[in-house]
From Swiss-Prot:
Residues binding ATP: I38, G39, R40, G41, A42, Y43, G44, V45, V46, K61
Domain free text: The TXY motif contains the threonine and tyrosine residues whose phosphorylation activates the MAP kinases.
Subunit structure: Interacts with MKK3.
One GO term of the biological process aspect: defense response
Family from the record: Belongs to the protein kinase superfamily. CMGC Ser/Thr protein kinase family. MAP kinase subfamily.
Species name: Arabidopsis thaliana (Mouse-ear cress)
PTM note: Dually phosphorylated on Thr-191 and Tyr-193, which activates the enzyme.
Modified residues annotated as Phosphotyrosine in this record: Y193
Reactions performed catalytically: L-seryl-[protein] + ATP = O-phospho-L-seryl-[protein] + ADP + H(+); L-threonyl-[protein] + ATP = O-phospho-L-threonyl-[protein] + ADP + H(+)
Positions bearing Phosphothreonine: T191, T196
Co-factor(s): Mg(2+)
Protein name, entry field: Mitogen-activated protein kinase 7
Residues at the active site: D158
Described function: MKK3-MPK7 module acts as a positive regulator of PR1 gene expression.
Length: 368
């Protein structure tokens, strides 16, 4: 539970109060009353809380010492920039970013999100049974949120069950945009090492210089397979093993299916693998709806140019009765996430402060 404590240096900042949870100090705005800690990661601690002004339950994520690691600082800045623009039922909403007391020396960042009950990883590993309707509804919402992001030229690049939040009504929201990029960005990010390995598309594993929205579709396929089978479909131990597991399922590729591989060494590796006829997905998931298997087969296509698009996946017969194109308008404008990866800490700090001001216009006025 959350325990009210005195400020560590005895000096209380105006408009703040102090709580301890899981040996972590929360210095938060007085309008928020913490309830209990609900999650912990490399970034810090998340707690559930109530906004006393609106009586709304929210999740507060404390990112501790955000500037200790520049990569983490850039991830946080990227998430702030993206979520300020995004408004969609299937994307997590960032409600507030608390304004620290000191503009030039703050170390911690407090993000306030809408509160969800659990995530898809927890549901998959639980003993709770999942009907075909459950599987279909989760997939539909994931594709719907992704279609919106792709309409804004945003690649998520780190889709996995733990980044899909779910509530008691089975509503699903995509979260964690620290690795997201614009699909029309420069080549610098096109060669980065991204996405949790098990959900990583072949073109990323093969270090291709160019990739697009189809990387997210592959991740969706891996997630959907995991929903159907209650275990990861490609639990690779390292990059080369990951590719071998993929070929064992999708089968050895024709020359025409590996033209997208622009790295000669990577192409030679794929050609060197023992021949595999592949495994039909209906054998892996015999209880699954045949239409679900057909759609999954179209998502888990090795060649990204032949992989089904998000829009076509939503129009697939398995999604019949769920998708209404008119109720899923695109994002109003493309969102730019182009950030100079070599920025120094003071510049990143100032950019974060400016993002925070969008949630605190009164502070901007008082500082004018």
């Amino acid at each position: 539970m959350a325990m009210l404590v005195e400020p560590p240096n005895g000096i209380k900042q105006q408009g703040k109060h102090y709580y301890s949870m899981w040996q972590t100090l929360f210095e938060i705005d007085t309008k928020y009353v913490p309830i209990k800690p609900i999650g912990r990661g490399a970034y810090g601690v998340v707690c559930s809380s109530i906004n006393r002004e609106t009586n709304e339950r929210v999740a507060i994520k404390k990112i501790h010492n955000v500037f200790e690691n520049r990569v983490d600082a850039l991830r946080t800045l990227r998430e702030l920039k993206l979520l300020r623009h995004v408004r969609h039922e299937n994307v997590i909403a960032l409600k507030d970013v608390m304004l620290p007391a000191n503009r030039s020396s703050f170390k911690d960042v407090y993000l306030v999100y809408e509160l969800m009950d659990t995530d898809l990883h927890q549901i998959i590993k639980s003993s709770q049974s999942l009907s075909d309707d459950h599987c279909k509804y989760f997939l539909f919402q994931l594709l719907r949120g992704l279609k919106y992001l792709h309409s804004a030229n945003i690649l998520h690049r780190d889709l996995k069950p733990g980044n899909l939040l779910v509530n008691a009504n089975c509503d699903l929201k995509i979260c964690d945009f620290g690795l997201a990029r614009t699909s029309q960005g420069n080549e610098q990010f096109m060669t980065e090492y991204v996405v949790t390995r098990w959900y990583r598309a072949p073109e990323l594993l093969l270090c291709c210089d160019n990739y697009g929205t189809s990387i997210d579709v592959w991740s969706v396929g891996c997630i959907f397979a995991e929903i159907l089978g209650r275990k990861p479909i490609f639990p690779g131990t390292e990059c080369l093993n990951q590719l071998k597991l993929i070929i064992n399922v999708v089968g050895s590729q024709q020359e025409s299916d590996i033209r997208f591989i622009d790295n000669p060494k990577a192409r030679r590796f794929i050609k060197s693998l023992p021949y595999s006829r592949g495994t039909h997905l209906s054998n892996l998931y015999p209880q699954a709806n045949p239409l679900a298997i057909d759609l999954l087969q179209r998502m888990l296509v090795f060649d990204p140019t032949k992989r089904i698009s998000v829009t076509d996946a939503l129009l697939h017969p398995y999604m019949a009765g769920l998708f209404d194109p008119g109720s899923n308008p695109p994002a109003h404008v493309p969102i730019s996430l182009d950030i100079d990866e070599n920025m120094e800490e003071p510049v990143i700090r100032e950019m974060m402060w400016n993002e925070m001001l969008y949630y605190h216009p009164e502070a901007e006025i008082s500082n004018a």
